Amino acid sequence: MADESNKVAAEVRDSFGKGAARKIRAAGKIPAVIYGHGSEPVHITLPAHQVGLLLRKANAVLDIDIAGKTQLALVKDVQKDPVLQIIEHLDLLVVRRGEKVQVEVPVHVEGEPFSGTIAMLDIPTIKLEVEATNIPERIVIDVTGAEEGTQYHAKDFALPAGAVLAEDEDLLLLNIIVPAAARAEDEEAVVEAAGDQAAE
C-alpha cells in the first residue's frame, strides 16, 4: 500500500547507455522507466538506498514525485547484477487508486506437518487480481499437523478481502510428503525386521 513512507523523489534523466547507467549507479541512484495509462514512458533516476529498502516488500507500490507531480507506480520488473545483486534498473507501471492489477504474491508456509513429513512447496507465488494500493505481502498456508499425501490447491484457502484468484483454482501449490531418505530408511528397517523373523 502506498503511504508516506513510500514517497520517492525522482529526477528525469536524459543520458542513456551503459556508461550513463554506470555513472548514475555510482552516484547512488537507480535508472528507471515509468509508463502506463497511455502516457509516454519517462526515464528517471531514483535514490538507490531508499528504493532498495522499499523493495524488500514484494509488489511495492511507490509514490513517485517527478518535478512536483506525483504518480503511484507498481514495481513491475527489477534487474539486478547476477553476482553483486545490485539493482541495475527498474520498470515502473503507473497505477491509480482503486485500480485492479494482477500480481504474483509470495506463498508462505507456516506450522509443522505430521512427524516425519515435510511441506514441499511446488509454486512459490500465486497470481491474484487486487487493488493496486492493497496488495497483500504474502499468502499463508498453515500445514500444522498435516499428514502425508495432503495437497493444497489454489482454491483451498481464503483470499484477502477484495482479492480474486487469477490462476486455475486447481493449481497445486504444496504437497505434504515423506522425504526420500526417510522412506528408504523405513523400507530398510522393514526388510531387516523380516529377515530377523525368517532367521528365528
Curated annotation (Swiss-Prot):
Q: Which UniProt keywords apply?
A: Ribonucleoprotein, Ribosomal protein, RNA-binding, rRNA-binding
Say if the entry is tagged with keyword Cell division.
Answer: no
Report the Pfam families cross-referenced here: Ribosomal_L25p (PF01386), Ribosomal_TL5_C (PF14693)
Q: Name one GO biological process term.
A: translation
Which residues constitute the signal peptide according to the record? none
Q: Which domain of life is it from?
A: Bacteria
PANTHER family on file: RIBOSOMAL PROTEIN L25/GLN-TRNA SYNTHETASE, ANTI-CODON-BINDING DOMAIN-CONTAINING PROTEIN, RIBOSOMAL PROTEIN L25_GLN-TRNA SYNTHETASE, ANTI-CODON-BINDING DOMAIN-CONTAINING PROTEIN
Query: Cross-referenced NCBIfam families, in alphabetical order?
Result: bL25_bact_ctc, PRK05618.2-1
Q: Which family does it belong to?
A: Belongs to the bacterial ribosomal protein bL25 family. CTC subfamily.
Name of the protein in question: Large ribosomal subunit protein bL25
The source organism is Leifsonia xyli subsp. xyli (strain CTCB07)
Could you read off the lineage of the organism from its UniProt record? Bacteria, Bacillati, Actinomycetota, Actinomycetes, Micrococcales
Which gene is this protein's source?
A: rplY
